[in-house]
Regions:
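Conserved catalytic motifs of the protein kinase core domain
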Residues: 7, 56, 106
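A short, charged/proline- and glycine-enriched loop
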Residues: 52-58
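Basic, glycine-enriched DNA-binding surface that flanks or lies within the catalytic cores of DNA
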Residues: 1-45, 49
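Cytosolic beta-strand hydrophobic patch enriched in CBS
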Residues: 11-14, 59, 84
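Conserved Rossmann-like nucleotide-cofactor binding loop
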Residues: 66
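Helix N-cap/beta->alpha junction signal
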Residues: 62-63
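TOPRIM fold recognition
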Residues: 72-191
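Phosphate-binding glycine-rich loops and their immediate beta-loop-alpha structural context
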Residues: 69
Length: 191
């Protein structure tokens, strides 16, 4: 991690298996409004910012700030586990770390608690299953993302989470299902 000279962005560098820089993600440090976020041109998305530990656990995040916030919230034995950022929701960096590190067989998807993050959780779980990884779990932040959880812990007003519209309807649909099933059973013999 370093600060770029021109705009004072935080730059998160991803290294390949030989320690060569292959990816850089910039995040603006300006605190008023939306900060700049983007990958440096020519970055290889397979080698995003990551940390590889000795345990079998891999935690997956949309962005480096989310990853660092999560680690700050879960400091106990953090160096033992592995972490990777997707710099969005693409699977390239996740699959690269799993291929490079065969000891990783427990995957925790820690994406943002918003519509895009929830949809990406489902998509990534499908990709993981297709690639033979079935020991997966979804960990959601209480607020919009792990950085917002960290802000809330320190008394700063967090951005709330956003549920997926289809998940909001789930309790309503679940409530009427038993009655619907009973009604269908009663009319089973109707042809």
């Amino acid at each position: 991690i370093y600060e770029d000279k021109e705009y004072h962005n935080a730059v998160f560098v991803g290294l390949d298996e030989k320690g060569i820089a292959r990816h850089a993600h910039k995040r603006g440090t300006y605190t008023q409004g939306e900060p700049y976020k983007g990958n440096v041109e020519g970055s290889d998305p397979r080698y995003s910012f990551h940390w590889i530990g000795k345990s079998s656990k891999l935690y997956v995040f949309e962005a480096p700030v989310d990853m660092l916030s999560f680690i700050t919230l879960h400091l106990k034995d953090w160096r033992e586990h592995s972490y990777v950022t997707l710099d969005g929701v693409s699977e390239h960096a996740l699959l690269q770390q799993l291929r490079q590190n065969p000891h990783l067989n427990e995957v925790f998807l820690c994406l943002d608690h918003d519509r895009a993050g929830i949809e990406a959780d489902g998509h990534l779980k499908d990709i993981l299953v297709e690639n033979g990884y079935t020991n997966t779990a979804i960990m959601q932040s209480t607020y919009k993302d792990w950085n917002e959880d960290l802000k809330a812990k320190h008394g700063v007003e967090p951005i709330p989470s956003e549920e997926h519209p289809k998940l909001i309807l789930l309790p309503q649909v679940s409530a009427v299902l038993p009655d619907l099933c009973e009604a269908l059973k009663a009319h089973r013999d109707i042809r």
